[in-house]
């Protein structure tokens, strides 16, 4: 039996602006296995951001079913969605979204504070920062850190609650190539060493090429899926599946 952490069935999202309706997603069905690493790609306006918002419990679909880590979240109230987000989703955004007056350690503690966790909060934040190579930067504020280090603080914050999934939206977009590679290696290591489920939303083919599966969106629908596997000599082979395969 498959262990699905994400199950989306016929997800449709319609935005209404006055009398005008914009259909951002059209009957999207997508399953993601626990421990899988995928990329969602597509041109601007393809529905990537809308799908990410739904997967991250930041928004609800207009219709369809979304089950995250065994919980039906499609029709939850705002406060229930907030609880699901805090417990089950870690976010890594292109912009670092750190509190400028707080230390790295305090920034990483935030999800634990929101969850009402008091015991061991500082220890868990410290361990998360050590996991991304920032054990010597606990008391540094964002202004005292490089861009790559700030992004690593955000990764530590994303993983401190042991989420079911981590959503990474263009995680290297604001970084130089060296810092971007360091951040990408940390994220890939979380998947390979700890089985963390990773969903990248990206335009970057380099990121996509290092995942197991690429979901291609076009005009709000899944236009196809590229599956990737590692051959005997370590090189990746890619083959294309038909429209809507997941």
Task: Please place each PLM-identified region on the residue numbering.
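ABC family nucleotide-binding domain
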Residues: 4-217
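H-loop (His-switch) and adjacent beta-strand-loop-beta switch element
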Residues: 214-227
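ABC-family P-loop ATPase nucleotide-binding domain
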Residues: 1-14, 224-246
